[in-house]
Amino acid sequence: MAEATKEQRHPVDQVLPAGQMVVYGLQHVMSMYAGVVAVPLIVGSAMGLPFGELAYLLTAALLVSGLATLLQTLGIWRIGARQPLVQGTSFAAVASMLAIGKGAGGGAAGLTAIYGAVIVAGVVGFLLAPVFNRLLHLFPPVVTGVVITVIGISLLPVSFGWAGGGTGTPNFGDPANIALAAVTLLIILAIYRFLPGFLSRVAILAGLVLGTLVAWPFGKVDFSRIGQAQWFAVSTPFHFGPPQFEIAAIVSMVIVMLVIMTETTADILAIGEVIGRPADGRTVVGGLRADTLATTISGGLLNGFPVSAFAQNVGLVAITGIKSRFVVAVSGIILVALGLVPKLGAIIASIPLPVLGGAGLALFGTVAASGIRALSRVDYDGTSNIIIVAVSIAMGVLPIASPTFYEHFPSWFQTIFDSGISAAALTAVLLNLLFNGTRRDAEAPIAAEGPTPGVVPDEDVPGGRSAG
């Protein structure tokens, strides 16, 4: 009887052997580590913080990301999507945070102004989460397919920058950097193609490790940070001072929070498509609550920034086929450990950017491919769906291809449309309402088309996800 129950359990709720979960969890961390630490480094540098305080922001970001990931994957009451979603500091908030911080004079004063705005935005987002649930019918396949595709497209320039050695660096585009990225990608492809079972599923992790080893003899790996890093550090509440609450900063951050919630909704729907468990309204609300609660705690206590689901890890789930949320929970534990033990974080930080770029090409491209697969299910015959897809993708790609296109527009407009993801989502929703209205055949989200063949529906799984 116990064996039958185990066989019926949805892959999302399966607990794998401990060794496998650690390896798969580490692979998730290594694929998103650079994205997590980039935000505090950018903001901290702009605020003029010394190296020690920059390192403090970095460990705080890792700690917050880990706690948020645990909240999202395991869930508490009605909080958490209970999906294999990795949480991390959100790039969507960077521009607004820089404006808020510089407006407050930079330094610690700038950070406290940012934290005050983050706290209020998180609370507002938490209260608005059920409204997003009621708006779920606005995300039929033609909309979610567009958004998922643009998520992948918007992430690809990040991997391009990494592959070149880091955008803005003196040696950007050096053939040696590009060759290293190419070697890493070829290693991943070779492992994925020729090695069986478990080995093919850790192709990304193996590619990162082997790519780093290849880079070492050529002086591309800097291990000095490992010796300099502390063994243990804890992020104490209000390290930079009590939060400051300014109306203009709060309004700006609330707008950003709405953008982040839109992106997180798309990620929840995307991972639902990948894992074969349709994302219903309860799942979306739980995921948004986890996002916004973690953001509130991040700004209020842990010296962190807004968090959101990381789309690149959706691609990793698609590549590996490992759908267990407990694997991603292990990722959260690893992130917490990295946040408490900076020396461990310094080891991962030693991975050269070109190596990350090579792996990112496979990861981010897979996200875009998932969106294209979703769009292949849309009915284009006798409908206006083709023009909806065309214009929405164009609006999403516009700020990616021309980052300064909206520089003369008001700041609130830039906050929304400088994000290709939110621009594509808003355009697709409005055009779908214009051409398709809210008729029944356009209401179901992409993941609601029916369970993947061979997958046991959630409600039929003994011991499956709770109703919380």
Where are these regions (language model features)?
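N-terminal signal-anchor module of multipass membrane proteins
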Residues: 2-85, 92-104
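Hydrophobic, membrane-embedded alpha-helices of multi-pass small-molecule transporters
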Residues: 19-36, 173-185, 203, 216-218, ...
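Intrinsically disordered, low-complexity non-transmembrane regions of multi-pass membrane transporters
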Residues: 1-24, 223-238, 273-277, 434-468
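Generic transmembrane alpha-helix signature in multi-pass membrane proteins
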Residues: 40-44, 94-106, 133, 157-164, ...
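Membrane-embedded helical hairpins/re-entrant loop segments and their flanking transmembrane helices
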Residues: 18, 44-82, 252-325
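Short, non-helical or kinked segments that cap or interrupt transmembrane helices
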Residues: 56, 78-92, 137-146, 199-205, ...
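Membrane-embedded alpha-helical modules
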Residues: 102-221, 331-445
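Juxtamembrane interface elements at the cytosolic ends of transmembrane helices
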Residues: 3-6, 36-40, 44, 184-194, ...
